[in-house]
Amino acid sequence: MKGFIDDANYSVGLLDEGTNLGNVIDNYVYEHTLTGKNAFFVGDLGKIVKKHSQWQTVVAQIKPFYTVKCNSTPAVLEILAALGTGFACSSKNEMALVQELGVSPENIIFTSPCKQVSQIKYAAKVGVNIMTCDNEIELKKIARNHPNAKVLLHIATEDNIGGEDGNMKFGTTLKNCRHLLECAKELDVQIIGVKFHVSSACKEYQVYVHALSDARCVFDMAGEFGFTMNMLDIGGGFTGTEIQLEEVNHVISPLLDIYFPEGSGIQIISEPGSYYVSSAFTLAVNIIAKKVVENDKFSSGVEKNGSDEPAFVYYMNDGVYGSFASKLSEDLNTIPEVHKKYKEDEPLFTSSLWGPSCDELDQIVESCLLPELNVGDWLIFDNMGADSFHEPSAFNDFQRPAIYFMMSFSDWYEMQDAGITSDAMMKNFFFAPSCIQLSQEDSFSTEA
């Protein structure tokens, strides 16, 4: 199967019941080892279909607008468009990308908090009217360049975790909302609703209680100025687990019934990103170099094997200047699986994993316990579908990993039963039975 990079058509291997993700990875590890190719992704599109089904079951009252910057792989966007999601776009390129798939402007929101004038004009030109705003300067830019804009006031929430104030960078205070409503009235900018965002790192779901209460206050304020409010955007913040989705729904559902009841004419939307794609993609990387170091050279507080055995530093053919770019702004807590088979009683050694750049920032895993690996061995990282597909840096001649798409026959039939057909709604897809055949000896390895 051809690896997708920017192909016009996406080849998707259909897997029978006897073939699983591990078999697919084994197949491409073998191929890439023979050809000396780079790291690669395997994308299970069936998981995206399942996530959408889960969303419709748990939070059917909330329409998802997928956050495009999370994973803008065209195949992902096309299958989500076929499923009927909206799209939250942060740039001109993202708006153009989803409109090329036939997505109507009414199903696109321009969510960038800091918009270039040229991009506001582009949104006006292509009919993308709904956008977010949290300050007076942005309101004035919108007023001058998009006469048909419909604005969601972005309000701040109280989800600062561990001293991190990332969410306070964007979003106005409740106190400042009246001033912004006054400005919008003077500028003749149409305010149609409110947006807030609660970080996925937030475990205090009481934050949603405060945010929804504040949103209701803004709706009431806006009514005083004569604005017709008809949309509430509760942002992203969904990790992808069914438990978290149910927990959030348990908190917000009764509040939505109170503050924004059904029949009130208010559409409830959200901007899930990693929820849809994180678990759908697996990354395979190759060990290209290794060093043996003394165990006590590792910094204090990191995982050690508690012995006098040596520790190992491994360098991989992908790093923060490629698929692990999000590691620069957030902690990556995942520990990879070792692809090769090893004995259960094989000793484990303190290990550190680095990208290929030799940059001190290019550390992927500070410390973990792994069996001794050799140059040419492969490591498997799960849940790599979010924030992993940006343009790679030209540093060290990095190349974007190939993507191999798959879907089980059962997921494919489920998709057909839902009325999503490749000939009518997913015209760029080519579905074909996979021909992967592996011996028992080549089967997927156990976890490290």
Swiss-Prot record:
It comes from the Eukaryota. Pfam families: Orn_Arg_deC_N, Orn_DAP_Arg_deC. GO terms for cellular component: nucleus. Expressed during testis development. GO terms for biological process: negative regulation of protein catabolic process; polyamine biosynthetic process; polyamine metabolic process; positive regulation of polyamine transmembrane transport. It is found in: Nucleus. The record marks K69 as: Not modified. Keywords: Nucleus, Polyamine biosynthesis, Ubl conjugation. SUPFAM superfamilies: Alanine racemase C-terminal domain-like, PLP-binding barrel. GO terms for molecular function: catalytic activity; ornithine decarboxylase activator activity. Ubiquitinated, leading to its proteasomal degradation; a process that is reduced in presence of antizyme OAZ1. Belongs to the Orn/Lys/Arg decarboxylase class-II family. ODC antizyme inhibitor subfamily. Monomer. Interacts with OAZ1 and OAZ3; this interaction disrupts the interaction between the antizyme and ODC1. Antizyme inhibitor (AZI) protein that positively regulates ornithine decarboxylase (ODC) activity and polyamine uptake. AZI is an enzymatically inactive ODC homolog that counteracts the negative effect of ODC antizymes (AZs) OAZ1, OAZ2 and OAZ3 on ODC activity by competing with ODC for antizyme-binding. Inhibits antizyme-dependent ODC degradation and releases ODC monomers from their inactive complex with antizymes, leading to formation of the catalytically active ODC homodimer and restoring polyamine production. This is Antizyme inhibitor 1. It comes from Mus musculus (Mouse).
